[in-house]
Amino acid sequence: MEKDTKQVDIIFRSKLPDIYIPNHLPLHSYCFENISEFSSRPCLINGANKQIYTYADVELNSRKVAAGLHKQGIQPKDTIMILLPNSPEFVFAFIGASYLGAISTMANPLFTPAEVVKQAKASSAKIIVTQACHVNKVKDYAFENDVKIICIDSAPEGCLHFSVLTQANEHDIPEVEIQPDDVVALPYSSGTTGLPKGVMLTHKGLVTSVAQQVDGENPNLYIHSEDVMLCVLPLFHIYSLNSVLLCGLRVGAAILIMQKFDIVSFLELIQRYKVTIGPFVPPIVLAIAKSPMVDDYDLSSVRTVMSGAAPLGKELEDTVRAKFPNAKLGQGYGMTEAGPVLAMCLAFAKEPFEIKSGACGTVVRNAEMKIVDPKTGNSLPRNQSGEICIRGDQIMKGYLNDPEATARTIDKEGWLYTGDIGYIDDDDELFIVDRLKELIKYKGFQVAPAELEALLLNHPNISDAAVVPMKDEQAGEVPVAFVVRSNGSTITEDEVKDFISKQVIFYKRIKRVFFVDAIPKSPSGKILRKDLRAKLAAGLPN
């Protein structure tokens, strides 16, 4: 990562002035700092059963859960795993752990048993908070390793019920000293290459990131206590956890929780609760654009539609503008390691700026961005494409137990290299044009080719394999495999797909298999994915 520093860096900043950020505060103290102004207002609305928790309720329940976790043996710097869909309990567990100076690692409840256990093991989780239907995925691992399982619905044999946490006395929270650099969240990300790694996000980092979005006289993302935010994106993903939950808590907005996206409930909830802020991802935007039912609902309350996690095309933008007549539509750009927000659309500001279609915002305030030539390491002026780099208090502390991967991602001067290629135009707007990194983006979810390749190579009838993205209208990208059969093997496409689908979550399943004589590689043995992508683009895989 050490690049030749021949010239002075060309650094880009927000059009908004820097602000004071109280990032000495622990995350929970910061989020609830102004709670006296809205303690009786709705904080969480459970879309599934219409239950409403006020800000006072959420703070109290989170404190009770903190005391309960302490009673179950959780100490500062210990980790709990939250293996849940969006739910009030997810919120109470996450904030409860923060009160103790403990860490939450969030996992997708749809993960296979192997994927969940891998993350539980890597993060050294002491407690797993989940639902009864997922207990079988972790039961053997938990019992062998003295890990407690706490269920939010019914508790199968050997598991505890979430009420052991919520019935604790909130005054029993121990006094703990939380340092700004202590880790509070540990999402897993594949980074720019390779297998999923624990991303250490600190109290200071998340406080800074939330403040960069919603604090200040002219916040970049203007949300207030009269707003209703739709939380349909999964909270185990940092975009939803940060830009929906934490930002919403900080400003006193109502957060309407949906367990999973389905278009009818989605439209009904927007109409019933007069949702004003819609943080979406392109697949949801596509569903809105394509559904004839949208016209039967009143969506006029929505004033902001944010899209993140993957680029949104111009046609899609125009269609959505027509469906949400009163909404400003814009994009943000994030990466888990960056805390996660790097850039955000300034049309969302309290005093908005004009924006361009296709841009993903301008760099957030209190941060610095530069565009670097991947070959020379020199920073580039406006309108020249290079690797996007970000620096500021919001970025990750590093990867858990992986100093090498950390050093490859963050240089000695504190610059985080994103692996994304983009440029900044004359109006400070950021455009993303390509990815250096190898990740496949399926509906905003990361798929690491290396993970699938390792599984493919375990098959006795496969001698070599490479996985690359293929464009897909609905998902954005899907994984496809190029496979070299072992001597004399007659393994079929369906057999390969079936072999993988048993081992991974749905979005990592291989959609096509192309059999080849050899995988193209560089002299150092690196797979030349560029060549394989070019083959796909030319329509000549075999």
From Swiss-Prot:
Biological pathway: Phytoalexin biosynthesis; 3,4',5-trihydroxystilbene biosynthesis; 3,4',5-trihydroxystilbene from trans-4-coumarate: step 1/2
Binding-site positions, CoA: K260, K443, G444
Region annotation SBD1: where it falls in the sequence: 262-331
Annotated InterPro entries: AMP-bd_C, AMP-bd_C_sf, AMP-binding_CS, AMP-dep_synth/lig_dom, ANL_N_sf
Keywords attached to this entry: ATP-binding, Ligase, Magnesium, Nucleotide-binding, Phenylpropanoid metabolism
Cofactor(s) it depends on: Mg(2+)
Amino-acid positions noted as binding (E)-caffeoyl-AMP in the UniProt annotation, renumbered to this chain: Y239, S243, A309, G332, T336, M344, D420, R435, K437, K441
Mutagenesis or variant effect for R435A: Strongly reduced activity against 4-coumarate
Binding positions for (E)-feruloyl-AMP per the UniProt entry: Y239, S243, A309, G332, T336, M344, D420, R435, K437, K441
Superkingdom: Eukaryota
Positions that bind ATP: S189, S190, G191, T192, T193, K197, Q331, G332, T336, D420, R435, K526
Induction, per UniProt: Induced by wounding and methyl jasmonate (MeJA).
EC number(s) on file: 6.2.1.12, 6.2.1.-, 6.2.1.34
Reaction(s) catalysed (UniProt annotation): (E)-4-coumarate + ATP + CoA = (E)-4-coumaroyl-CoA + AMP + diphosphate; (E)-caffeate + ATP + CoA = (E)-caffeoyl-CoA + AMP + diphosphate; (E)-ferulate + ATP + CoA = (E)-feruloyl-CoA + AMP + diphosphate; (E)-cinnamate + ATP + CoA = (E)-cinnamoyl-CoA + AMP + diphosphate
Effect on the protein upon substituting Y239A: Strongly reduced activity against 4-coumarate
Source species: Nicotiana tabacum
Binding site for AMP: G332, T336, D420, K437, K441, Q446
Function description: Major enzyme of the phenylpropanoid pathway that mediates the production of several precursors for numerous metabolites and regulates carbon flow. Catalyzes the formation of CoA thioesters using 4-coumarate, ferulate, caffeate, and cinnamate as substrates. Follows a two-step reaction mechanism, wherein a (hydroxy)cinnamate substrate first undergoes adenylation by ATP leading to an acyl-AMP, followed by a thioesterification in the presence of CoA to yield the final (hydroxy)cinnamoyl-CoA product. Almost inactive toward sinapate.
Gene: 4CL2
Name used for this protein in its record: 4-coumarate--CoA ligase 2
Domain characteristics, as noted in the entry: Both substrate-binding domains (SBD1 and SBD2) are involved in the substrate recognition, and are sufficient to confer the substrate specificity.
